Design a protein with these regions (language model features):
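Buried hydrophobic residues that stabilize the cores of well-folded domains
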Residues: 2-242
Length: 242
């Protein structure tokens, strides 16, 4: 298990622990996603349960693997992922979500460098070695995210890093390597600014005995640019690996 991650023909890492639960807790409530895999370690289904303001909402996702194609369906809606050499190159979403008709581009290290949403709009990723250091949106000069590191790493990967591609996407949370986003470098801070707010997110981590991330605490400080008012929110992510 200490070897370099090894991939099978589907592009899935097979010699590391699998994510079986992701729990997000903040002051408003909790979101829990549970993941189920086949005997080859490929995600086949996931259930997300959100408990906010006294109400519970559950979604079930089903994942179907084909030749160079993966379909993730939920409540009759489906995202289709097209793959080449174990990497997602295109997505289409029948519900017109974030990943409707999006092209994925990678660098020579199979890291994601661009999500092209349409002819004009894209999100670009900048890497320094194994570290994702910057994300920038073409449709806003203001909207840039910069990530800072101090050398912390983990076994496996940090699942929430793939949320910059799309959040609540169980396939990508379970298999971020399919989108070139299997990050084991752990950011200390993510700084971002848009037209309204300046945001600083500080991260601390705990680990299980094998070095996988067990919990991640995110403290977000938002500062309004027009009046310098600040507010702080804390979110705790917990991960269960098997």
């Amino acid at each position: 298990d200490d070897d370099e991650p090894s991939k099978n023909d589907d592009g899935v890492i097979t010699n590391q622990k699998l994510l079986v639960e992701l729990r997000v807790t903040d002051e408003d409530g909790v979101s829990i996603t549970e993941y189920s895999y086949d005997s080859n370690g490929k995600l086949v289904s996931a259930t997300n349960t959100e408990q906010y303001d006294g109400s519970t909402h559950t979604s079930t996702y089903t994942v179907t693997w084909g030749a160079n194609k993966i379909i993730e369906s939920r409540n009759g809606e489906a995202i289709t992922y097209t793959l080449e050499n174990g990497l997602i190159t295109h997505t289409s979403d029948c519900d017109g979500g974030d990943l409707d008709n999006t092209d994925f581009t990678y660098n020579a290290n199979n890291q994601l460098v661009k999500l092209q949403y349409d002819e004009e709009d894209y999100l670009s990723y900048t890497w320094q070695g194994e570290k994702l250091t910057k994300m920038a949106w073409s449709f806003s000069d203001e909207d840039i995210h910069e990530l800072s590191y101090s050398g912390k790493t983990c076994k496996g990967y940090l699942p929430i890093m793939v949320w910059s591609v799309d959040d609540l996407c169980p396939l990508l949370e379970a298999h971020p390597e399919l989108a070139g986003m299997r990050c084991n470098q752990l950011p200390d801070k993510i700084y971002s600014k848009d037209e309204i707010d300046e945001t600083t997110e500080q991260y601390t981590y705990t680990f299980d005995k094998d070095g996988y991330v067990e919990s991640c605490t995110e403290v977000s400080t938002y500062k309004r640019l027009d009046n310098n008012e600040t507010r702080t929110e804390t979110t705790i992510y917990t991960f269960t690996w098997e």
